[in-house]
From Swiss-Prot:
Pathway connected to this protein: Pyrimidine metabolism; UMP biosynthesis via de novo pathway; (S)-dihydroorotate from bicarbonate: step 3/3
GO cellular component, one term: cytoplasm
Binding-site residues, Zn(2+) 1: 58, 60, 150, 303
Cofactor: Zn(2+)
Keyword vocabulary terms for this entry: Hydrolase, Metal-binding, Pyrimidine biosynthesis, Zinc
Superkingdom of origin: Bacteria
Disulphide bridges, residue numbers: none
Reaction catalyzed: (S)-dihydroorotate + H2O = N-carbamoyl-L-aspartate + H(+)
Protein name as it appears in the record: Dihydroorotase
Amino acid sequence: MKLIKNGKVLQNGELQQADILIDGKVIKQIAPAIEPSNGVDIIDAKGHFVSPGFVDVHVHLREPGGEYKETIETGTKAAARGGFTTVCPMPNTRPVPDSVEHFEALQKLIDDNAQVRVLPYASITTRQLGKELVDFPALVKEGAFAFTDDGVGVQTASMMYEGMIEAAKVNKAIVAHCEDNSLIYGGAMHEGKRSKELGIPGIPNICESVQIARDVLLAEAAGCHYHVCHVSTKESVRVIRDAKRAGIHVTAEVTPHHLLLTEDDIPGNNAIYKMNPPLRSTEDREALLEGLLDGTIDCIATDHAPHARDEKAQPMEKAPFGIVGSETAFPLLYTHFVKNGDWTLQQLVDYLTIKPCETFNLEYGTLKENGYADLTIIDLDSEQEIKGEDFLSKADNTPFIGYKVYGNPILTMVEGEVKFEGDK
């Protein structure tokens, strides 16, 4: 058994003194003071905040096929360092988990290497090509968390509709990277004033919002749970809000970088600032914040997307899309939104725990007696600088290097086992 002493937990929105007794994989007791019995391992939280473990429904672990960027082991170590105890990896790997054979191989890699709980997606279409549906019932039987072709949008309405019908039959979500290929125009950043200043092709807002508008109507017709990945535009927020008001089962996520940065933060032709969807305008960012606070957007997900340094050293027009986020999400959001009084600590924790779990009917995301001992101990008071050399991910492609942040996890536990502690 383990006993976390001298911690603070959120109760009714306030930090309260609490000890947590853990028996195996579950929390046995939470109380203001618990006397240790013989043989109990004591973990001294030293007055720090003990949070439910975070749940990230959108990460890229790159394995199999992209191990030079990230592996299941390094990606989940990075997740643990960031306080995440559950992650859901996208299927844009090689091979794609689009068959029982491929999914079984992926699951074995996870079983052998993962440092946190991993709930893998299966693809919607074979090889994510948008031409042939996968076998939904067979992949659900293997353990598919949900279905997505993330990395690309499903381009034809008929294929998306047929996929939604199949997903509804097996009671799983369709999770969509919304991007109309006919509207990308070879873009490498947001189509706006900054792209014009830099002379870089831009991706317009409608590239995303048009596909969401199509899909919410398809989801209504199919009776399917439809989840929108990494919402980035004000038009998308409006479409999702209207769909929810109409009673359509649509949910959505937003990334930390879209909440924190805009096109105005891009200093020049620097691919560290290249992600998909791109950093949008100030108006878009404000709409995302409003949508998160009013419940239009359900949760926060990182879209952790590691790449090799030489790949991101290329010009924006040639470099791959994506930034890492597992190790920086909570500190950045805590520093920029909670420390300055825009959000409460409870709000932020909910966006990373209860909200994603409610979105996908997961049994995690809370600290409660008889619940899983998934938790992270966080130092809310000490300032640290974000440094790439401190990352446990293979990659450090993020524009937040050098930022000074509070709220750094110092210990992460998954089902009662310590998976990250300090610099270990």
